């Protein structure tokens, strides 16, 4: 038996992030998987990136000189193919349901132009993705919508890892003078990523090389 009052113990657990039962349970091991066909599943997600008018503190090392106050954020919407890591990305002003639906439609059209017909889409439980409008759009597009379990973003790990790569190799890769210049470089980076960048999960091939092997 504990000598301290229950309320004291509860506060101590809360301070350590252990106030909820699920935080005390061991996390299950990550179930890694990969769909066989290139169109079986695409993962979608959104990354918020700050806009800026001058070179930021990540480059200058000075938060005061590198600050661009009041310019807001861009939302980087990503869609990545599960089997071959082929990626489609747009920088958009928000992540509202209409914006998310428009992005999904254009992403599907682009994947179709690459010879990939998508059957399923996986997302997290963001407000846009759980909306009735998004559910209806998936039905119209003949997509099965799979949502990750609450509080388990690693379920959508391929999108999460691609966003990390995108930030490292594009968004924070060089001292862009402003966010508009950063965004202009995105199509160039995506071309390199899809056509030329070797991927360890694809045995050293690029996404388009692996897709070409599969479709031929």
Predicted features and spans:
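RNase H-like polynucleotidyl transferase catalytic core
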Residues: 120-125, 139-158, 174-179
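Residues immediately flanking
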Residues: 46, 82, 94, 125
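C-terminal domain-tail junction helix/linker
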Residues: 39-40, 132, 139-143, 165-216
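Mobile-element integrase/transposase regions
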Residues: 19-80, 86, 102, 117
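Acidic/histidine-rich, metal-coordinating catalytic segments
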Residues: 95, 114-131, 149-151, 203-208
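Active-site beta-loop-alpha junctions of metal-dependent nucleic acid enzymes
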Residues: 66-68, 72-73, 90-114
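Basic, flexible linker segments flanking DNA-binding modules
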Residues: 1-54, 127, 135-136, 149-153, ...
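DNA-binding alpha-helical recognition surfaces that contact promoter or target DNA
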Residues: 11, 102, 184
